[in-house]
């Protein structure tokens, strides 16, 4: 009785329908006890109808689960598709903001590099001023040695440097704020990616429900067929009892007094006292033997059929649990996807802040960069001033040397002139004396009162007025050569 084709009672209808001739009621105590036992066992087996009911419930539940799984898959897939597209948009925005950050970082480093170079040039020039001592010939006697840098105010340079340091500090603070915003954006994207990765929807082709449902429907159909075979077997047993003298009484007695450990069986509604008095249509000997043969054969398979019903039910329960687990998994996926969508909504609420942070960083950096460049121009202007200052000092040395040379030339010329004048004076005095000696006795004195005057005396001297200063100082030859060389390099 493993299948409907071999089920108990599969040939009973043919046997019953072929009974056309009256037959005496079957006698024999042994046969009666066997028939009663088969009937009660068959009646007990009919309680397996609960497995068929459960099978129908499972199939109905599986169909509902299939519909629910399709809906959940569609909803989750739709949400995840939307989330995936929005994540692509967010990544583009993130990359755009990162470009702003990277450009700012690169620009900041370039500006700092340029600033360091400008400051290094200024410091180098100041070091030259610091190491260039003013020649003592230019300063009052007894004064402590002083460098060229001592004659300029360094506070202006320090003020510019302090201003640049403050601008750099503000720029770093702005960068730090942008870093915080960017890291927060990265955390949001990381949460989305992590959640999205863990809630991927399985493609519909991977769903176990359709195959399980087909198996469940097959089991349900087989179980219905098995139950039908049990019912046919019971009808055959009942028919045999009807054709056995005292059969109903024996059945009622056996049902009322079951052996110890046996499952009670109710035969009310099946057995009726009046049946004993009904003259059943008699069976031929051949029909009786054929019926008993089929009954005995089917009775041996009743227990196997009942076991098969239970086994199929157990297998259906396992499949059903797997279906429910899959639906539960899909439900959880949908819940997780919904939670990710809520995270996405939160990210989009914060997104304007991230974009504004990038725009604010760019604007503030451009303003700071303009100020830094302005300060660098001031530094460069100060450096050029110091360079010109150093060059002017070299020019001063060369000018003093030139003046000294000019003075020396003037002195030489004056000395030569004085020598010539002195010679002229001496010659003039001699001529005057000779003239007076020759004609002095003859010329009246009052004729020309100046006749006896001495020759005029001439002299060269340095003019002294408000702008006059002492003679230009003498400078060492080495100092003049160094300044001349440096001035030539500056001019070249």
Curated annotation (Swiss-Prot):
Keyword Cytoplasm listed: yes
A single GO cellular-component term on record: Atg1/ULK1 kinase complex
Record flagged with keyword Isomerase: no
Renumbered residue ranges of the record's region Disordered: 1-23, 469-492
A Pfam family reported for this protein in Swiss-Prot or TrEMBL: ATG17_like
Domain of life: Eukaryota
Keyword list, A-Z: Autophagy, Cytoplasm, Membrane
Listed Basic and acidic residues bias regions: 475-492
Subcellular location: Cytoplasm; Preautophagosomal structure membrane
InterPro entries assigned: Atg17, ATG17-like_dom
GO biological process, one term: pexophagy
Disulfide bonds: none
Lipid bilayer topology: Peripheral membrane protein
Predominant cellular place of this UniProt entry's protein: cytoplasm
Biased composition (Polar residues): 1-20
Transmembrane segments: none
GO molecular function, one term: protein kinase activator activity
Family label: Belongs to the ATG17 family.
Functional description taken from the UniProt entry: Autophagy-specific protein that functions in response to autophagy-inducing signals as a scaffold to recruit other ATG proteins to organize pre-autophagosomal structure (PAS) formation. Modulates the timing and magnitude of the autophagy response, such as the size of the sequestering vesicles. Plays particularly a role in pexophagy and nucleophagy.
Protein name as it appears in the record: Autophagy-related protein 17
């Amino acid at each position: 009785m493993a299948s409907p084709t071999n089920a108990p009672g599969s040939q009973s209808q043919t046997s019953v329908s072929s009974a056309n001739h009256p037959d005496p009621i079957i006698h024999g105590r042994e046969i009666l006890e066997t028939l009663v036992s088969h009937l009660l066992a068959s009646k007990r087996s009919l309680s397996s109808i609960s497995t068929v009911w459960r099978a129908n419930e499972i199939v109905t539940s599986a169909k509902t689960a299939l519909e629910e799984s399709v809906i959940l898959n569609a909803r989750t897939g739709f949400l995840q598709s939307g989330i995936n597209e929005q994540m692509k948009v967010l990544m583009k925005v993130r990359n755009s903001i990162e470009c702003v950050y990277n450009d700012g970082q690169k620009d900041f480093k370039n500006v700092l590099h340029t600033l360091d170079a400008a400051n290094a040039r200024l410091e180098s020039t100041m070091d030259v001023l610091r190491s260039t001592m003013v020649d003592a010939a230019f300063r009052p006697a007894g004064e402590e040695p002083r460098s060229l840098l001592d004659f300029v105010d360094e506070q202006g340079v320090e003020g510019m440097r302090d201003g640049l340091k403050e601008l750099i500090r503000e720029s770093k603070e702005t960068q730090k704020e942008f870093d915080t915003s960017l890291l927060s954006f990265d955390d949001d994207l990381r949460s989305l990616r992590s959640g999205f990765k863990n809630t991927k929807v399985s493609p519909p082709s991977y769903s176990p429900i359709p195959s399980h449902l087909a198996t469940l429907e097959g089991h349900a159909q087989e179980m219905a067929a098995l139950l039908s075979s049990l019912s046919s077997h019971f009808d055959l047993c009942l028919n045999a009892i009807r054709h056995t003298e005292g059969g109903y009484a024996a059945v009622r007695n056996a049902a009322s007094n079951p052996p110890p450990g046996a499952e009670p069986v109710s035969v009310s509604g099946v057995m009726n006292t009046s049946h004993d008095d009904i003259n059943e249509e008699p069976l031929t000997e051949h029909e009786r033997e054929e019926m008993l043969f089929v009954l005995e054969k089917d009775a041996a398979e009743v227990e196997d059929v009942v076991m098969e019903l239970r086994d199929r039910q157990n297998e259906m329960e396992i499949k059903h649990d797997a279906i429910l687990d899959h639906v539960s998994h899909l439900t959880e996926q949908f819940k997780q996807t919904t939670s990710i969508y809520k995270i996405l909504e939160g990210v989009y609420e914060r997104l304007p802040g991230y974009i504004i942070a990038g725009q604010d960083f760019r604007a503030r950096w451009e303003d700071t960069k303009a100020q830094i460049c302005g300060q660098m121009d001031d530094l460069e202007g100060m450096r050029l001033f110091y360079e010109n200052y150093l060059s002017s000092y070299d020019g001063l040395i060369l000018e003093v040397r030139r003046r000294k040379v000019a003075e020396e030339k003037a002195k030489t010329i004056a000395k030569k002139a004085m020598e010539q004048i002195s010679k002229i004076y001496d010659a003039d005095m001699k001529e005057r004396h000779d003239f007076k000696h020759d004609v002095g006795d003859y010329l009246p004195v009052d004729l020309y009162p100046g006749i006896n005057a001495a020759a005029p005396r001439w002299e060269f001297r340095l003019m002294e007025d408000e702008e006059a200063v002492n003679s230009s100082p003498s400078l060492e030859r080495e100092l003049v050569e160094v300044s001349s060389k440096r001035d030539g390099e500056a001019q070249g």
